[in-house]
Amino acid sequence: MSKTVIAGNWKMHMTCAQARDFISAYLPLIKNVPKGRELVLAPPFTAISTLSEILKGSNVSLSSQNVHWEDNGAFTAEISPKMLLEHSVSYAIVGHSEPRKYFSESDKQINLRAKSAQANGLIPIVCVGETIEQRERGEAERVIRRQVEQGLEETDKKKLIVAYEPIWAIGTGKTCEANEANRICGLIRQWANCPEILIQYGGSVKPGNIDEIMAMSDIDGVLVGGASLDPESFARISNYKVE
């Protein structure tokens, strides 16, 4: 696994036609991305098959936006690791704040998803983060530590990514100060008890702040939302500059 992972989460955006147009514009802009910098896109499930074909031989990997812990069964609206592997998917996002919030996903369920992903050769991107209310009450560190310890239980921490996404910064235009994001990512590394673990930052990442974010010592990549929907914007993020 690369030491730096730049991932774009499209959420519930992009038809197959729009995904094709995006890739046509994006790929020419990332030809000179430095070696060792992994680029990842997490499209909606409907576009995975299309992108799997288009991206063959490129320097872009695919991620799913979720994955179930069973290989098959009566789990309406879910998708299994084996289904994803058929389409050359390499990563799986689990524990994003939106399914945590809207579908009441627990740390136990997220842990099951992460373990299932690893057991099938996928690299889980385990999302953690606090709400603004939790931060204002001084509970941020306790909440994130619980998510890390329970979400990563019985996993191989050298073969996964933790994405720190303060919920109050997702899609709001508010960005956690780079030094504070770096501090939390450093704590996550301690709580995981694995110096080699890869940690991303997510939360209103955009071309204007990517260079500062990636200059931080404990941040190994980013998980990008809205800014990953525009090929030029995501290309600038992919080509971030190192001082």
Swiss-Prot record:
Binding-site positions, substrate: 9-11, 171, 204, 225-226
Catalyzed reactions per annotation: D-glyceraldehyde 3-phosphate = dihydroxyacetone phosphate
One GO cellular component, as annotated: cytosol
Keyword flag Cytoplasm: yes
GO biological process: gluconeogenesis; glyceraldehyde-3-phosphate biosynthetic process; glycerol catabolic process; glycolytic process
Active-site annotation: 96 (electrophile), 165 (proton acceptor)
Transmembrane segments: none
Keywords from the UniProt entry: Cytoplasm, Gluconeogenesis, Glycolysis, Isomerase
Family according to the record: Belongs to the triosephosphate isomerase family.
Subunit and partners: Homodimer.
Function: Involved in the gluconeogenesis. Catalyzes stereospecifically the conversion of dihydroxyacetone phosphate (DHAP) to D-glyceraldehyde-3-phosphate (G3P).
Protein name from the UniProt record: Triosephosphate isomerase
